[in-house]
A protein has these predicted regions:
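Glycine-rich, acidic/polar active-site loops that bind/position phosphate-bearing ligands
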Residues: 1-211
């Protein structure tokens, strides 16, 4: 039986190779130390029997090598400026927290149609071709009944997101054909962004099951 140890010191800070960041391998490995730092304000979760711990990734001299670090710094800067303004109005606060609830719109396309389009495969969007026979002029898709296979996809997506602690709230059709939307419950900014990334990952993982 394999036994793995994970200490609190390793949780607070790790030291992986950062030679590929931020520009794709311009630095020698021996000169490219990077550090992972635990983000204790974002929830850890279990995915595929693996404990996933949200972290920030910075260089030896403190430069951001990821997209989470600038977000955390932006939240802190916004809090500092909001506190400064509030003090002008006589309010004594220690921290101002921001919340967001990013809606995730998406298209569900049959696998055979997707694989026939190089633009979809390479860029995730259509770059050429004739306009759709039916566009966004009418409202019957937005207010229409959700198709059974789409509803089944949405149900499984909700269940998998709840297992990861992502609080999905509403789901509905969107305006364009094959377009749909998932709306989460508002949460602290960095937590909401982590949840949004998990949502997109689970969508891509579950969708192929439904053709």
């Amino acid at each position: 039986t394999a036994i793995m140890e994970f200490s609190g010191k390793e949780l607070v800070r790790g030291e992986p190779d950062a030679s590929s960041f931020p520009s794709g391998g311009l630095r020698a490995t021996c000169e490219a130390r990077g550090y992972t730092a635990w983000d204790p304000t974002s929830y850890a979760f279990v995915k595929d029997d693996v404990l996933c711990i949200p972290t920030a990734f910075v260089s030896y001299t403190g430069e951001a090598l990821d997209k989470k670090t600038p977000l955390l710094r932006s939240m802190n800067a916004l809090s500092n400026q909001a506190i400064r303004i509030l003090k002008l109005f006589g309010k004594d606060v220690d921290y101002v927290s921001t919340t967001v609830g990013p809606e995730q719109e998406y298209f569900l396309i049959k696998t055979e149609d997707y694989e026939a389009r190089q633009d979809l495969i390479l860029t995730g969007r259509t770059l050429f071709g004739a306009p759709s026979a039916k566009g966004q002029e009418l409202e019957e898709h937005y207010f229409g009944v959700i198709r059974p296979e789409v509803s089944a996809f949405m149900k499984e997506l909700d269940e998998e997101l709840w297992k990861l602690g992502v609080p999905a709230k509403t789901k509905h059709n969107e305006v364009a054909p094959c377009q749909h939307e998932l709306a989460p419950i508002f949460d602290t900014t960095n937590v909401a962004i982590d949840h949004n990334l998990l949502t997109m990952e689970m969508m891509k993982k579950i969708a192929p099951k439904y053709g």
